[in-house]
Amino acid sequence: MAKKTHISETPATAWLKAHGVVFTEHPYEYLEHGGAQHSAAVLGFDPFAVVKTLIMQDEAAKPLAVLMHGNRTVSTKNLARQIGRKSVEPCKPEVANRHSGYLVGGTSPFGLKRAMPVWVEATVLDLPAIWINGGRRG
């Protein structure tokens, strides 16, 4: 379902513009707990090409962002091993909101409130195009 055509700027879209990144906006009706699968279905995109941004933390409660295909899950055990941490776990929504500056369900890796490492599933980089949240739900 299409949403209004005027879309206000977010820290993510401001960051993209400031860095000369070409992008198009695809608003949709947000569904609580719908996730990347819902946005992919509503917009008619392949869920594998819809990339979700997850805010996690390591054993020292230091935040990190993880970019993963919309139809895949993150193995926190494998992630911790890959990035040299003892453990990694998803942040509680209120903690993720505080670290990122975005509401869960509208998190973008661009324009994050707090600087943090961003880890990308390697196969995301093989895609010719991706759809990723622009800093707002919907």
Task: Name each model feature, range by range.
Residues 1-138:
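Extended, low-hydrophobicity, polar/charged segments
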